[in-house]
A protein has these predicted regions:
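Structural motif
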Residues: 6, 59-62
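Oxyanion-binding and handling regions
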Residues: 1-40, 44, 52-55, 93-119
Length: 119
């Protein structure tokens, strides 16, 4: 079982793009209305969400990233942003396949964390 408590989950595959933030046992979701075309939108949304909830992004924080399948460019943008956060803040980074998360809700994400993450 993984010891992932606080995390950012990025599920941007070109369709129903979302990010989620679990911090201090609270879970927040941001739905993107349009396909993520560039990293500026994703980065500013992540910064706004983490600043709003006063998140400390450090080695105790994890990022979960959807590896697809989906839009190659959208997945690349999301992965690049996640890797940038990993490098700059020394967070743990995990990937998952789109099929392992049938619905973007906390209960399903917790099952995903316990069973289907790729380090």
């Amino acid at each position: 079982m993984n010891m992932i408590k606080d995390f950012l989950i990025i599920s941007c595959t070109g369709k129903n793009d979302k990010i989620g933030l679990k911090i201090n046992n609270n879970f927040f979701i941001h739905d993107f209305q349009n396909k993520i075309q560039n990293n500026e939108i994703l980065v500013s949304t992540i910064l706004n969400l983490t600043n709003k909830h006063k998140v400390k992004i450090d080695q105790n924080f994890s990022i979960l990233i959807n590896n697809g399948p989906g839009s190659f460019s959208t997945i690349r943008v999301a992965l690049s942003v996640a890797k940038g956060i990993k490098i700059s803040n020394k967070v743990k980074l995990f990937g998952f396949k789109n099929s392992y998360l049938p619905q973007f809700i906390l209960e399903n994400i917790e099952v995903l964390i316990n069973e289907n993450l790729i380090e």
